[in-house]
């Protein structure tokens, strides 16, 4: 199926199977809907999977010292061939670099603020980005370790589900066009900025409205004035400059914040 071919491709690109006959991997999970399918196909490939699932119920775990300690212990005890995550986690990239263990990840969201972290530059990374624009922006920071790889689907699971539905269910759910995905309202970071000034809010609203009239061209970043950037930073958003790749404040504001606002507006 599509997904098993792509997972196999990921492993070959990353490791080249240099005489490896036994594979043990650490799968750091946070609750992505893509994780169960990836996990099932890792198992189908005969890979022994150690799952770290604390973040399933503690969403702040990856930013805590406890996470560093837990990953350190797991890497020391199990010595996995590689660590895998859906999306990119800087803390895992750091720990894998320290232990000289390969870190594989596959993005399923865009934008991802964590990709702006300098840890994407480690040679132990194998970062697969599903969005071409995302790939074109980040690949120069680690050209030998960042790859473009579109999303895949578990065709077998979906075919099985389709075969099992009743005639009435088919009538209820058959449409010419379907949208399955997040509305982004639950993950829009601008909603959390209670102290955003009227000037900044109006500026963002005008960009959002303009973007709805133009298809196929992303002009957000070039539309941000220096004055707006400084005004936006007054919300006390933390841009840890020593951890950012180059000067990416403008890109982060454009895509991580305003981009989410546009996505929510478009989908609702």
PLM regions: where:
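Generic secretory/membrane-interface signal
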Residues: 1-4, 47, 125, 170
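Nucleotide-sugar donor-binding catalytic core of glycosyltransferases
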Residues: 19, 24-34, 144-145, 150-268
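Extended catalytic core of nucleotide-activated donor transferases of GT-like folds
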Residues: 29-140, 157-160
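Low-complexity, compositionally biased segments
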Residues: 7, 19, 46, 72-75, ...
């Amino acid at each position: 199926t599509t997904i098993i071919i792509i997972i196999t491709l990921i492993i070959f690109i990353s490791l080249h199977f240099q005489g490896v006959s036994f594979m043990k991997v650490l799968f750091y999970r946070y609750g992505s809907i893509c994780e169960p399918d990836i996990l099932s196909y890792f198992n189908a490939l005969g890979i022994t999977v150690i799952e770290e699932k604390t973040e399933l119920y503690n969403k702040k775990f990856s930013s805590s010292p406890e996470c560093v300690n837990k990953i350190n212990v797991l890497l020391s005890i199990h010595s996995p061939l590689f660590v895998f995550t859906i999306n990119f986690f800087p803390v895992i990239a750091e720990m894998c670099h320290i232990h000289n263990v390969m870190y594989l990840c596959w993005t399923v969201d865009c934008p991802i603020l964590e990709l702006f972290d300098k840890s994407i530059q480690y040679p132990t990374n194998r970062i697969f980005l599903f969005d071409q624009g995302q790939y074109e922006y980040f690949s120069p920071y680690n050209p030998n370790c960042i790859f473009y790889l579109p999303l895949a689907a578990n065709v077998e699971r979906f075919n099985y589900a389709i075969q099992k539905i009743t005639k009435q269910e088919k009538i209820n759910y058959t449409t010419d066009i379907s949208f399955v995905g997040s509305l982004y309202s639950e993950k829009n970071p601008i909603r959390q900025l209670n102290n955003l000034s009227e000037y900044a809010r109006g500026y963002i609203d005008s960009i959002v409205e303009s973007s709805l009239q133009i298809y196929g061209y992303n002009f957000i970043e070039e539309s941000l004035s220096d004055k707006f950037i400084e005004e936006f930073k007054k919300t006390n958003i933390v841009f840890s400059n020593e951890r950012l790749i180059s000067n990416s404040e403008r890109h982060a504001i454009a895509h991580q914040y305003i981009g989410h606002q546009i996505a929510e507006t478009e989908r609702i």
